[in-house]
């Protein structure tokens, strides 16, 4: 009966994936219970009184990072609906590329939407399906939606996990004692002491019923197309992706980057925290000194995934501070994991020069990002991307 507490711990481990809001829905065998808040998990779900409002042996949770729909309490997941076959709660990571088209069709046929999130489209399609059994309703829905997604759904009898046919967004399975856990990353399993079993496969539906894990694969087999940004930025460094820690991929990128040019500089400096593994790889390969020329304030959220450009711009100075005595009159190689809009990088370079750096050579660990991402990363237009407008 501590499902909600374990869910809160898992959400805490996944806080890096979204900071706009968080929510948990639990089921006690008879009733569903829901608590949603704007802000961080630790600000709301560490309180025992809040967790007491979420009884039951089943629960799902979600951290919001908006790609569709405004930042507001009504858009915080998991969503809940009472269907004629029983209750349904849904948490969704990703983005549906045909959500607006489906939404307009549903509205024309009498559906009433309470949110602006594409996740509600999934709920409405399941509710509208004329199939009798829940899994059939879900499959009916999945054949209508397009995009990159991982879903966790909870009904009166089942806990269900779904990954899109191309495996764009991640989903893993773990086990704790006799209970199964679905999560976006393995770090959420680690924090509760669960054993990592495997990743959910492309186009696979996994479900737990009567304490047994079962699987169906309704889609034709597709070539795997995982989001490269999971490897580069999103996933926590200690999370496993394809059997390796994200940290290893990032460090290897830094090592390969160092092989491209032989720069003369005093120090290799990472943009913390996401640039640290690549900078370590770069320093190791180039045999240069690694220094923390920037110190991060860990009480400020991740700049890239803040919802507006104005907040992103302010967030850089709130988040990072140069170590002046280290970098003064020094030549630096500044390593970051990626360059999207260029907002953060421009301000960091300016900050380093103002702190006394003699030279700043910027090196980016991942290839140029020239095209929008419509599958769950907030890069909706080409004009926003620095590399696309050089």
Where are the regions a protein language model picked out?
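Conserved short alpha-helical segments that host acidic/polar catalytic motifs at enzyme active sites
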Residues: 1-201, 207-265, 271, 359
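Flexible loop/turn segments at secondary-structure boundaries
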Residues: 2, 67-68, 98, 168-169, ...
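A generic structural motif
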Residues: 22-25, 292-297, 360-366
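Secondary-structure transition/capping motifs at alpha-helix termini
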Residues: 111, 131-132, 260-266, 284-291, ...
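Amphipathic alpha-helical
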Residues: 121-133, 272, 284-302
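PRPP-dependent phosphoribosyltransferase catalytic core
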Residues: 142, 157-158, 193-199, 218-220, ...
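Extended, hydrophobic alpha-helical segments in both membrane/secreted and soluble proteins
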Residues: 268, 275-282, 286, 290, ...
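Short, glycine/charge-rich flexible loops or terminal/linker lids adjacent to PRPP-binding catalytic cores
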Residues: 287-333, 343, 370-380
């Amino acid at each position: 009966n501590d499902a909600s507490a374990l869910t809160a711990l898992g959400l805490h481990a996944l806080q890096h994936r979204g900071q706009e809001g968080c929510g948990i829905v639990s089921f006690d065998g008879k009733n569903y219970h829901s608590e949603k808040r704007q802000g961080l998990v630790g600000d709301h779900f560490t309180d025992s009184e809040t967790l007491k409002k979420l009884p039951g042996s089943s629960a799902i949770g979600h951290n919001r990072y908006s790609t569709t729909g405004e930042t507001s309490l009504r858009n915080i997941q998991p969503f809940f609906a009472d269907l004629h076959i029983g209750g349904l709660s849904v948490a969704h990571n990703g983005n549906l590329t045909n959500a607006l088209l489906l939404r307009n069709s549903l509205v024309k046929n009498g559906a009433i939407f309470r949110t602006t999130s594409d996740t509600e489209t999934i709920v409405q399609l399941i509710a509208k399906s004329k199939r009798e059994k829940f899994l059939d309703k879900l499959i009916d829905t999945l054949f209508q939606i397009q995009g990159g997604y991982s879903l966790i759904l909870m009904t009166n009898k089942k806990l269900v996990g779904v990954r899109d046919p191309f495996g764009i967004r991640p989903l893993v399975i773990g086990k704790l004692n006799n209970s199964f856990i679905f999560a976006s990353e393995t770090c959420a399993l680690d924090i509760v002491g669960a054993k990592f079993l495997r990743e959910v496969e492309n186009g696979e539906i996994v479900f737990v019923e009567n304490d047994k894990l079962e699987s169906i694969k309704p889609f034709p087999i597709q070539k795997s197309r995982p989001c490269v940004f999971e490897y580069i930025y999103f996933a926590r460094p200690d999370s496993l992706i394809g059997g390796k820690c994200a940290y290893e991929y990032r460090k290897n990128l830094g090592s390969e980057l160092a092989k491209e040019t032989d720069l003369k500089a005093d120090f290799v400096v990472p943009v913390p925290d996401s640039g640290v593994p690549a900078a370590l790889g770069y320093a190791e390969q180039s045999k240069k000194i690694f220094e923390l020329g920037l110190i991060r304030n860990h009480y400020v959220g991740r700049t890239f995934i803040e919802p507006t450009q104005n907040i992103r711009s302010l967030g850089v100075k709130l988040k990072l501070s140069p170590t002046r005595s280290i970098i003064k009159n020094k030549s630096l190689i500044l390593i970051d994991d990626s360059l999207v809009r260029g907002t953060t990088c421009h301000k960091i370079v300016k900050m380093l020069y103002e702190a006394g750096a003699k030279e700043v050579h910027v090196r980016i660990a991942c290839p140029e990002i020239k095209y929008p991402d419509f599958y769950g990363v907030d890069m909706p237009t080409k004009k926003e991307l620095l590399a696309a407008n050089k």
